[in-house]
Amino acid sequence: MIASLAYDLSQDGTFYKTMMGISPEQAAEFAEECGANIIALNCGTGMDMKGAALVARIYRDHCGLPVMVQPNAGLPVLENLKAVYKQLPADTAREVPAALEAGAAIIGSCCGSTPEHTREIRRMVDQAARRN
């Protein structure tokens, strides 16, 4: 079972919580207690790969489960009544080493991501694997 939660960055940019007020610390402890096999994050306001690395570290510090991250490709902007994600694939991928170092065992992507984002993420994962 995968326990995956969407987090929003606080207005002051200092912490992440779900829309119901659950912190990553609480989620990690509860997921492990309930028998989840993987603790994960996806989506959310302000949840890009950099934020995913921060939450992944919190997860690792609060439970022993494998960590999966699937963040957005940045924050969308409204253009002609359409949500447009402007984060470039290289910008998403740049934070992959931090997510791996923080303990992410599985890395994917969510809203706004394109096949090119996925290719760049894979390239960075492969690069990190060659170094280790």
Positions of the model-derived regions?
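Domain-level signal for soluble alpha/beta catalytic cores
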Residues: 1-132
